[in-house]
Amino acid sequence: MRRILAGLLVFVFAMPAARATDVISVKLMTLELAVDIAQGAIDACRKDGYQISVVVVDRSGRTQVVMRDIFANQYMTQLARAKANAVVLSNTSSSALRKNRADIVNELNLLDDLLVMDGGLPVTVAGSMIGAVGVSGAPGGDLDEACAQRGIDRVQERLDFAE
């Protein structure tokens, strides 16, 4: 009887631990943070003389913010979104994806709303991606990526101290 009781006690106390993994917590980017990242990228590119589009997506690739400078055309917005989606797919910058997976870049670029070109960066908190930013419109993907980085830099302290 004692063995049965001991076994039941172990089972009962082990159940909450097993159930604890049924629910997870995730960090999500606020609209305010996404707006500040996008505005930072726009401001950075304007300072350098470029008219760009910026798209900020959440960790699942859902669009949170779209900003298009006055002379940036609609295709730049599509390209920026597709670059951000490449980041969500790979959990790394779109330039790193292009370099690291050169063997399948052509196939990846056939996917709808995904483009493996420089200009997309992850937004991370404590090593976890909470979103991505894509930029298009500067004269070169490296410059798009630099503007995206400056957008993230604008909020980096907030990211560093996020709970």
Explain the meaning of each model-derived region.
Residues 3-16:
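Bacterial N-terminal signal peptides
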Residues 20-163:
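Flexible, solvent-exposed loop/hinge segments and secondary-structure transition points
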